[in-house]
């Protein structure tokens, strides 16, 4: 129902408009309070890059964070990542990730980023605390914050917005009548707009998600997707239909598609009941897999995806980030 409302296919959004006006007014006041100096932002001693979005729901933000980390690492830079840690609850914050930290503590996306990149990752409700914790333990050249475009308490040097190229901004209304956290006009003040799927517009950076081979959660074995048949596909992400579409485009034979809520926590018996028997493959997202590895079965697989940003804008973006890092380094010396 909410997808129909947000996409503009249902006129029920009229009932939610008063709440949306209130949401928009509050967010406007918050942003203005920082712009006018009524509230103070904290400046980190290293450059901060925010990767965020204007809408609720999955847009492909985490793959972009991973892409940035990996490409900056290849250029020789020491990169850290901070996050709010949605879906996790730690005994104390800030929480620095290591191999013993679980998704129940840190959330699924920070654990995924940590496992994929090996970069230092910290989570905290206040991103300032997470950045400070990282810098107390690691010498870093740049910090990337996963989400946090609207977290104005942390000053940023670069703002990147990721958009779902198929859904874009839905009906254009603020939450809850629509998907918007901020109005589309906010894009005029960011450094780059990355469009996941669809057709990018002028000055937008096109992006696609490229699927790898299926990986077995238990053994780590990799197989081409074409070798998995009669698959039960499951996804607990912001926009599950994107995952299912990726599988269909790859020619996967899907018996069932099961969508869970974003940041869903799973129980072993819950997932074991999804397949007919122990031979039918259960194929999930990598974000789901980080929550299921401790109780995985032999027939459970996940599909890693990588963000691919279109050239030449991808290289231009990295060059811009590098110039910011170098400028900060020269100012410190």
Curated annotation (Swiss-Prot):
<dbReference type="GO" id="GO:0009244">
    <property type="term" value="P:lipopolysaccharide core region biosynthetic process"/>
</dbReference>
<dbReference type="InterPro" id="IPR003758">
    <property type="entry name" value="LpxK"/>
</dbReference>
<keyword id="KW-0443">Lipid metabolism</keyword>
<dbReference type="Pfam" id="PF02606">
    <property type="entry name" value="LpxK"/>
</dbReference>
<comment type="pathway">
    <text>Glycolipid biosynthesis; lipid IV(A) biosynthesis; lipid IV(A) from (3R)-3-hydroxytetradecanoyl-[acyl-carrier-protein] and UDP-N-acetyl-alpha-D-glucosamine: step 6/6.</text>
</comment>
<protein>
    <recommendedName>
        <fullName>Tetraacyldisaccharide 4'-kinase</fullName>
        <ecNumber>2.7.1.130</ecNumber>
    </recommendedName>
</protein>
<keyword id="KW-0444">Lipid biosynthesis</keyword>
<keyword id="KW-0418">Kinase</keyword>
<dbReference type="InterPro" id="IPR027417">
    <property type="entry name" value="P-loop_NTPase"/>
</dbReference>
<comment type="similarity">
    <text>Belongs to the LpxK family.</text>
</comment>
<keyword id="KW-0441">Lipid A biosynthesis</keyword>
<dbReference type="GO" id="GO:0005524">
    <property type="term" value="F:ATP binding"/>
</dbReference>
<keyword id="KW-0067">ATP-binding</keyword>
<dbReference type="GO" id="GO:0009245">
    <property type="term" value="P:lipid A biosynthetic process"/>
</dbReference>
<dbReference type="GO" id="GO:0009029">
    <property type="term" value="F:tetraacyldisaccharide 4'-kinase activity"/>
</dbReference>
<keyword id="KW-0547">Nucleotide-binding</keyword>
<feature type="binding site">
    <location>
        <begin position="55"/>
        <end position="62"/>
    </location>
    <ligand>
        <name>ATP</name>
    </ligand>
</feature>
<keyword id="KW-0808">Transferase</keyword>
<dbReference type="GO" id="GO:0005886">
    <property type="term" value="C:plasma membrane"/>
</dbReference>
<comment type="function">
    <text>Transfers the gamma-phosphate of ATP to the 4'-position of a tetraacyldisaccharide 1-phosphate intermediate (termed DS-1-P) to form tetraacyldisaccharide 1,4'-bis-phosphate (lipid IVA).</text>
</comment>
């Amino acid at each position: 129902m909410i997808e129909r409302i947000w996409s503009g296919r249902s006129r029920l959004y009229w009932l939610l408009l008063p709440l949306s006006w209130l949401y928009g007014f509050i967010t406007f006041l918050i942003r203005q309070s920082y712009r006018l100096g009524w509230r103070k932002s904290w400046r980190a001693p290293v450059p901060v890059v925010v990767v965020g979005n204007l809408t609720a729901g999955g847009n492909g933000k985490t793959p972009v964070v991973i892409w940035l980390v990996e490409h900056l690492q290849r250029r020789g830079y020491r990169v850290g990542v901070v996050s709010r840690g949605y879906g996790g609850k730690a005994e104390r914050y800030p929480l620095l990730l290591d191999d013993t930290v679980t998704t129940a503590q840190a959330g699924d996306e920070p654990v995924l980023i940590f496992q994929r990149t090996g970069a230092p990752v910290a989570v905290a409700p206040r991103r300032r605390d997470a950045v400070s914790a990282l810098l107390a333990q690691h010498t870093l050249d740049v910090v990337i914050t996963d989400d946090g475009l609207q977290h104005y308490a942390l000053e940023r040097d670069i703002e990147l917005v990721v958009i779902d190229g198929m859904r874009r901004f839905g009906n254009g209304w603020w939450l809850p009548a629509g998907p918007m956290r901020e109005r589309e006009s906010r894009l005029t003040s960011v450094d780059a707009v990355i469009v996941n799927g669809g057709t990018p517009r002028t000055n937008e950076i096109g992006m696609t998600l490229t699927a790898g081979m299926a990986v077995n959660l238990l053994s780590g074995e990799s197989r081409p997707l074409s070798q998995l048949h009669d698959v039960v596909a499951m996804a607990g992400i912001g926009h599950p239909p994107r995952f299912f579409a990726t599988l269909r485009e790859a020619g996967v034979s899907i018996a069932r598609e099961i969508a869970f809520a974003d940041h869903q926590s799973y129980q072993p018996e819950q997932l074991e009941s999804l397949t007919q028997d122990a031979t039918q493959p259960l194929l999930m997202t990598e974000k789901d897999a980080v929550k299921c590895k401790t109780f995985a079965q032999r027939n459970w697989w996940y599909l890693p995806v990588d963000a691919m940003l279109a050239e030449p804008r991808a290289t231009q973006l990295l060059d811009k980030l590098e110039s910011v890092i170098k400028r900060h380094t020269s100012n410190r010396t």
